[in-house]
């Protein structure tokens, strides 16, 4: 069991049928996300992280689901559990600006099938599938 729990929020951003992904400093393909702080809501944090990490102004359509993972924090010297709420989002265009200053190595919009293959973690692939199903009307929306 993790000694420290971090509640996080992130965005699964679609522009048309394309999905925005970032490559982090470990060369993992991920979606924008961050820790919920300062009494902000999960929705606020998800929108903020999408804008801060990718320069994308998106709107939330629905909650896509939740994931969690544990890791050992070298700096904290204890195990940490990240619990993430993911939101299906739509951007009006394909414009973006990668926040290289936050350690990201790359990022872009990719066709859905390519994005599914690129994502490093299976949990992220499942959330992407769920978000797409919500956005195409193939799954019920639920928050």
Please provide the spans of the model-predicted regions:
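Short aromatic/basic micro-patch
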Residues: 30, 81, 109
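NUDIX/MutT-family hydrolases
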Residues: 86-88, 97-129
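The catalytic Nudix box helix
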Residues: 31-66
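Active-site segment of metal-dependent pyrophosphate-handling enzymes
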Residues: 55-95
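Hydrophobic pocket-lining residues within nucleotide cofactor-binding pockets
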Residues: 36, 91, 112
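N-terminal strand-loop-strand
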Residues: 1-32
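C-terminal alpha-helix
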Residues: 130-137
